[in-house]
Amino acid sequence: PAEAQGTVRLPERRDPVGNCSIVWIPSLSRPSLDSLRYAAKVSDQVIGVWVRSEEDDPAMIRRDWQRLVGESHGIQLHILESPFSSLVDPFVAFVASEEQLHPDVTHTIVMPMAIPRYSFDSLLLNQRGINMQRALDASGNRVFTLVRYYLPA
């Protein structure tokens, strides 16, 4: 389960790294939490971004975030509205906004990617993430990190 590894924390550092990781959070699952943990290791600031659909309850998302991630300094959650059921556009706009607000900081886009046992399953499983990466690639020079999670058999 996602809770098994404990909460996500930024390590204490003497000198800032100069990196902010923006982590796409499609759900509070093991791949997403592994992505947050990776981002915390390589960044001074971590921003988890959840683009919510109409069915998602923001209060429940925040409650689960609090339980799994906690109130760690330097790790934030942003819940974005999804007009017209688009998950890609709000995330791309958020990334562009952060880059514009903080041009002196390197921004790394961290995306969880589930790796299924059978390769043909990956065509459907990660389609949203692939579309997200393509949209972000099209609009500028960005650093991407894919955090892979191999699904059990």
What are these regions (language model features)?
Residues P1-A153:
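Cytosolic C-terminal regulatory domains/tails of membrane transporters and channels
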